[in-house]
């Protein structure tokens, strides 16, 4: 028999991983939520390149959030009402890395 707490944590923490490789001064959207109210999630960016990138997150009825992730750095933020997630390469070299989205991350500790 499965542990109910483990099942709850699995449901809350189904992560989605996107890999990016962007030319200099180029951006791309990686996630679009079809629910108009958006998604509550933890968004993590792992910048595995020597170029800084900008994380852009649009949200329902909230201002757009922008964060700079320096070369070789990691950044995570938990927000509500997420509609889109994108990355823009601010550097002069190819930028590559990963975007990890963990829906309903805050519920993990409530299970």
Question: What are the language-model segments listed below?
Answer:
Residues 13-18, 52, 61-69:
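Surface-exposed loop/edge segments in extracytoplasmic proteins
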Residues 36-40:
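Extended extracellular/luminal ectodomain segments enriched in beta-structured repeat modules
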Residues 78-94:
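Noncatalytic modules at the cell exterior or secretory-pathway interfaces
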Residues 33, 43-49, 87-91:
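Asparagine-centered strand-capping/turn motif at beta-strand->loop junctions
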Residues 2-19, 23-26, 92-111:
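C-terminal interaction-tip segments
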Residues 42-64:
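Short, surface-exposed beta-strand/strand-loop-strand elements in extracellular ectodomains
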Residues 25-27, 70-74, 82:
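Tight coil/turn sites that cap or link beta-strands
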Residues 28-32:
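Short, charged beta-strand/loop "edge" motif centered at a coil->beta-strand transition
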């Amino acid at each position: 028999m499965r542990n109910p707490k483990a099942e709850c944590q699995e449901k809350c923490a189904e992560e989605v991983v996107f890999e990016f490789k962007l030319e200099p001064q180029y951006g791309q959207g990686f996630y679009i939520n079809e629910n108009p109210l958006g998604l509550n999630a933890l968004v993590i960016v792992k910048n595995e390149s020597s170029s800084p990138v900008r994380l852009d997150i649009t949200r329902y009825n909230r201002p757009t959030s922008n964060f700079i992730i320096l070369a070789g750095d990691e950044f995570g933020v938990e927000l509500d009402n997420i509609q889109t997630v994108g990355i823009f390469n601010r550097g002069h070299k190819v930028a590559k890395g990963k975007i990890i989205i963990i829906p309903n991350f805050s519920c993990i500790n409530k299970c």
